[in-house]
């Protein structure tokens, strides 16, 4: 199974324009990429959807709001 880069998840979030919670983002990731999908970033690999959400949160990739969080292009690294 191919691994999906975390940037694809951040782009999905931007395209949707939605506010997410950890649970709703994990559900959206699974709906889009599949229950068994695995993810990687520039510094980690082999993550489940839930692990990716926690990783992205810890890396400061989310922008908090009163209804949850979103992200922005400025949160996506370009290396």
Curated annotation (Swiss-Prot):
> This protein's superkingdom?
Bacteria
The protein's matches in InterPro entries, at most eight in alphabetical order, are given as: Metal-bd_prot_put (IPR019620)
Pfam families, per this entry? DUF2492
Name this polypeptide is given = Uncharacterized protein YecH
The scientific name of the source species is Escherichia coli (strain K12)
């Amino acid at each position: 199974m191919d691994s999906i880069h975390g940037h694809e998840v951040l782009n999905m979030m931007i395209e949707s324009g939605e506010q997410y919670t950890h649970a709703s983002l994990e559900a959206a990731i699974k709906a889009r990429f599949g229950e068994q999908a695995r993810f990687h970033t520039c510094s980690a690999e082999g993550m489940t959807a839930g692990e990716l959400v926690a990783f992205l949160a810890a890396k400061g990739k989310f922008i908090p709001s009163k209804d949850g969080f979103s992200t922005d292009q400025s949160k996506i690294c370009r290396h």
